[in-house]
């Protein structure tokens, strides 16, 4: 297996970290999770072979530490051992050093300085209290004594806030850890103390939440030497307690007394090897125990994992690169050239697109909803047409109103025939009712044009120039409102025109004779039939002849009703308000029904006419006019101020986003080049 695969991932991590992004691509990495005081720091230092991690009480690791170990042979070509002084302390040498990504080019040969820099960089982001931050620190260590490996050291899980710790510190750490270990490409290194119940391990519990089958979790058992006499971890190693696909590795760490006494890691690793080789439970499997085996195992697991996921990583890098390149293209380059020409081109493009959207020729036609001109057609043929067809003239005009108008139009002498005056009065009143829905149609079309305007102003170019967008909106809205005035006037004139002349010879109008025939056919009584013989019964009784007194009530009786003879003889003056009575004579019934038929017939003609002509008027005065003159209006208004520099001032969001996209593209191009060589 080629160790350079791990270096590839390290290079990708650095490429993405330079733009401040850690989650752009899900890279293979080993994440370390554990409870506090489980011995995690000692495990990592044993793998490195150096003391370099901050130590103390409470939460010491307060930022993720991406630890990149690079195996680098010594300059002499020999595998130099880490030297110790007379007190057993590790000595620094020129073949081992550390480098921080935030301090490029600066080498730390003294590992105590590395610890100090970790503390300093942590406090720079989190302060000197016990707050935490998810922004990682990148540390690369070169040494001939390490295997090429990358580990992400995460803050230890805690339960109860201590001292100045935030009350929700447990939640903060849990969310941070889950953010790292929930990625499918993350190998979880769960560090657990062997002298505690494994079922209560916080690290394993959290790992099982995101990896319930234990497919990408490897367990590390620390403090094996501190277990009660007669107990061991053989059952755990055999997978009989909590099985993990990648298994467990037992290790021995330095105790607190050893650390305080500056016991070298080289000596501690030798003691670890002797412990496992001489222990009755582990002697036969000593080669699978200890820190050196753990490092080799992690190295092999990570390399296999990288090899398996590398094709997917290449695909994701290329997809992300295409995405950010497209966004960068939509944001456009920094404007170059004459600003007046730029504004002219924007006006031309906007007006052309406005026409295509209204005409339904846009390249971005939706398959899920109506848009543009289709919505205008819906207003014309569904909302407006159905709206005026639903208006019933007899919603407001009752039969009694019709009779009253009939009598009023007759003047002082009762009319022998039904005149046209009453018909025209009622029809004109009802035609006037069609004005409001017609004007409402104009308003709805205005709303649709504004909707199209807002749709066009959502284009990336207008997000780039917010002041120009505001000016476009103001000018076009004012233009639409100017278009509404002559449109409303024309529509009102059309309604008034229909009411100014009642064309009773219209070919579709029902004639008086036809209306009378329809009413008589509806009112004709069927001839009774003998149920036995089936023949018509002709011996009907002759209806009584009306007396002069009863016939005299055909007209006036409906107003005055019946009165006693004494009051009639007194000839009292009529009341201030006269209303028709509810009693109708046969003639009144017939006249009322006939005029209702005539009103409905003519009103339907007018409704059909307006349903056809109002959309045509709006199309002429608003839609067609706006398509032809919107460009002239924009040119006139925008060029009047000559404030092109101000209009083309880019928004801070656009400038910042372009910078971010440029950095992303540069980073992804670098990443693409890295993986293309593998």
From Swiss-Prot:
Residues 592-678 form the GED domain. GTP binds at residues 34-41, 153-157, 222-225. Keywords: GTP-binding, Motor protein, Nucleotide-binding. Residues 78-90 have a biased composition (Basic and acidic residues). Residues 222-225 are annotated as: G4 motif. Pfam families: Dynamin_M, Dynamin_N, GED. Residues 252-255 are annotated as: G5 motif. Gene3D superfamilies: Dynamin, middle domain (1.20.120.1240), P-loop containing nucleotide triphosphate hydrolases (3.40.50.300). Residues 153-156 are annotated as: G3 motif. One of its GO terms (molecular function) is GTP binding. Residues 71-96 are annotated as: Disordered. GO terms for cellular component: cytoplasm; Golgi apparatus; membrane; microtubule; peroxisome. Belongs to the TRAFAC class dynamin-like GTPase superfamily. Dynamin/Fzo/YdjA family. This is Vacuolar protein sorting-associated protein 1. The lineage of its organism: Eukaryota, Fungi, Dikarya, Ascomycota, Taphrinomycotina. The gene is vps1.
